[in-house]
Amino acid sequence: MKRLLLGLMILVSAARAAPEPASIVGEWWTPGFNARVRIEPCGEAVCGRIVWLWDEVPKGIVDKNPLIGRVVIDGMKSTQAGRWAGGRLYNPEDGRDYKGSLALRSPEQLVVDGCVLFICQTQVWRRADAARCPPVAMPPQ
């Protein structure tokens, strides 16, 4: 009986010690540190907005609307630990929305896939380090 109780206590403590999957909520740098995107919960999904740009109006951008505050990740729902799908990704370079998915490669790297039919493009975003990158205030909407 004592062995059974000891075994159960070990199992319960091991289950509690298991790390929770990392969250994508927070701020992320796009490749080349050209933009910073804040990912936050929105209902049962997550959404992401541009909170900082290297250039206010980057060259080659089709969309002439302001990009700061623009939603670029919309409606991504968790499909399994470390993966989100079912939402849309907005590409300011061509002004189009794409079917997308997100996956945590590590707590510091987010793989962002955008697809049209069977043609996909992948980017790896880096988590913005809060110690070196203070929070960016969003403009009023």
Provide a role label for each language-model segment.
Residues A18-G26:
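N-terminal helix-cap/turn-to-beta initiation motif at the start of protein domains
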Residues L8-A17:
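Hydrophobic h-region of N-terminal signal peptides that target proteins for export
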Residues I61, L110-L117:
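Short aromatic-glycine motifs in intrinsically disordered, low-complexity regions
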Residues P92, A103, C115-L117:
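Short polar/acidic secondary-structure junctions
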Residues I24-V25, P31-K99:
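Central antiparallel beta-sheet cores of small beta-barrel/beta-sandwich binding domains
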Residues S106-E108:
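Residue-level recognition of beta-strand termini and adjacent short loop/turns
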Residues M1-G7:
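Sec-dependent signal peptide recognition
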Residues V116-Q141:
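Edge beta-strand at a domain terminus
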